[in-house]
Curated annotation (Swiss-Prot):
Carboxylation is probably crucial for Mg(2+) binding and, consequently, for the gamma-phosphate positioning of ATP. ATP binds at G118, T119, K120, G121, K122, T123, T124. Catalyzes the addition of L-lysine to the nucleotide precursor UDP-N-acetylmuramoyl-L-alanyl-D-glutamate (UMAG) in the biosynthesis of bacterial cell-wall peptidoglycan. It comes from Streptococcus sanguinis (strain SK36). It holds the Pfam family Mur_ligase_M. Gene3D superfamilies: Mur ligase, C-terminal domain, Mur-like, catalytic domain, MurE/MurF, N-terminal domain. Its EC number is 6.3.2.7. UDP-N-acetyl-alpha-D-muramoyl-L-alanyl-D-glutamate binds at S42, T160, T161, S187, R195. NCBIfam families: murE (TIGR01085), PRK14022.1 (NF010628). This is UDP-N-acetylmuramoyl-L-alanyl-D-glutamate--L-lysine ligase.
């Protein structure tokens, strides 16, 4: 429940209040309204709802329909003139975040909040953190791959970082379920679209940065993408930063006045004696660790998670147990064919993560390597060039280009765009299942490998704006072993 008087105080303190318009009249103060629900979905609105108008696709008819079933007040950047009072603000998403916190009783102040940002590795690092904190605490997890608010039931999120109203509601649910910590991934879009406005994290972790999500509907430039990633540092009490990341110097200067730990190159927290399923750490996490996820980059993610948890009181024993217990669906999952060849299923969906994946596989598999991948339609268009230029440096690969969430684009046209940057022949098969069947048929012996990149554990393809059922790369690999 929230009163209109409280709404006005919060918005005025945030310098985000313009006025309330009722017909031809303008008000600076208002009273007599109490709201029992808050929503940005007009289909959920009724007489007791504080309704937010957000999004460029919002239509006046949505509001008119809500008014017809009893809606009596709304918050917006525009007066739609539908016969009820409107509270006008400069930024409705900003307002939505702060008012959601008040409505749900400020759960963000009662949970320990950990957030991860980076171009790659957010999900894996969040999983490491969840397993570490689960040893002695009761964490909730908000992840691209899986979300749990009670530690028992898991569901998939549609956004890396939910809309602020949904996010705060989930925090309240986690608190009601007796959770002590909340671990989440924070995308650059989360800051660009004010989904985490007003939140302060106990620990923020910056894993890495590389050009990605650059396109008409995401970030116009790399600078804009990088800036929005760095905002997590400004909104965290303590930070963990990968000192080996590109453009580290600006991040180092930005966090100088904060509590911080660096890990990786030229720091005291490094990895030595890196093996396929174990590593030794130096510095604050000094010791030997078992790990199920192969690849040095996964070991670095484990160190980042360990340092973050250490700041929240986790013991080294908890950190070791948590790292050893972590596996992630669709992240470096390995199957073995009847002929002994390995099949790697991984979510690698940009140039940097694909480069890391190739490096790990080529380190352990010395025979023929078949790579299957595609690029998403209508988003992240820069990835196509990144993939093509990277693959052009690996003429030893057998490459099959296929569909990966083509959306409104032709998957073969996307494949042609990737192939235009590759100087050796590649195969193009639009049907992903047929492409996987073909890829697995090309191996001959132990030492050979197939890499199924991009989809990870996703059991759908996005086609013409809809999620179409898809068995999943792992299930199809099992089918054709």
């Amino acid at each position: 429940m929230i009163k209109i008087e409280t709404v006005l105080v919060i918005l005025k303190e945030d310098h985000n209040f313009r006025d309330i318009v009722k017909g031809e009249e303008y008000f600076f103060s208002y009273s007599g309204l109490t709201f029992d629900s808050i929503s940005y979905d007009s289909r959920e609105a009724d007489a007791s709802t504080l309704f937010f108008v957000k999004g460029e696709a919002f239509k006046k008819e949505f509001l008119e329909k809500a008014v017809s079933v009893g809606l009596r007040f709304y918050i917006s950047e525009t007066d739609f003139q539908v016969g009820i009072p409107v509270l006008l603000v400069n930024d409705v998403k900003q307002a939505m975040s702060l008012l959601a916190m008040e409505f749900y009783g400020h759960p963000e102040k009662k949970l320990k909040l950990l957030a991860f940002t980076g171009t790659k590795g957010k999900t894996t690092t969040a999983y490491f953190t969840y397993q570490i904190l689960s040893q002695s605490h009761r964490p909730a997890l908000l992840s691209t791959m899986n979300t749990t608010l009670d530690g028992e039931t898991f569901f998939k999120s549609t956004l890396t970082t939910p809309e602020s109203l949904d996010l705060i509601k989930m925090m309240a649910q986690a608190l009601a379920n007796d959770r002590t910590h909340l671990i989440m991934e924070v995308s650059s879009q989360a800051y660009l679209k004010k989904r985490v406005y007003g939140l302060t994290f106990d620990v923020g972790v910056f894993l890495n940065i590389s050009p990605d999500h650059i396109g008409p509907i995401e970030h116009p430039t790399f600078e804009d993408y990088f800036y929005n990633k760095r905002l997590l540092m400004d909104n965290s009490r303590a930070v963990i930063v990968n000192s080996g990341m590109d453009h580290f110097q600006i991040v180092k200067e930005q966090v100088a006045s904060l509590e911080h730990d660096f890990y990786g190159a030229d720091s005291s927290n490094t990895i030595k004696d890196s093996q396929a399923f174990s590593f030794e750490a130096t510095g604050k996490l000094a010791g030997n660790y078992d790990i199920q996820l192969i690849g040095r980059f996964n070991q670095e993610n484990a160190v980042a998670a360990g340092l973050a948890c250490l700041r929240l009181g986790a013991s080294l024993e908890d950190i070791k147990k948590g790292i050893a217990a972590t596996r992630v669906p669709g992240r470096m999952e390995v199957l073995t064919q009847k002929n002994g060849a390995k099949v790697f299923v991984d979510y690698a969906h940009n140039g940097v993560s694909l480069r890391n994946l190739l490096s790990v596989v080529e380190e352990h598999q010395k025979g023929k390597i078949i790579l299957l991948l595609g690029a998403t339609g209508n988003k992240g268009e820069s990835r196509r060039k990144d993939f093509g230029l990277l693959l052009n440096q690996h003429p030893e690969l057998t490459v099959i280009l296929t569909a990966d969430d083509p959306n409104y684009e032709d998957p073969l046209a996307i494949a042609e765009e990737i192939a235009s940057y590759i100087s050796y022949p590649v195969e193009k098969i639009a049907d992903r299942e047929e492409a996987i069947k073909k890829a697995l048929s090309l191996t001959e012996r132990e030492g050979d490998a197939v890499i199924l990149a991009g989809k990870g554990a996703d059991a759908y393809q996005i086609v013409e704006g809809e999620k179409v059922a898809y068995p999943g790369d792992y299930a199809l690999a099992e089918k054709y072993l």
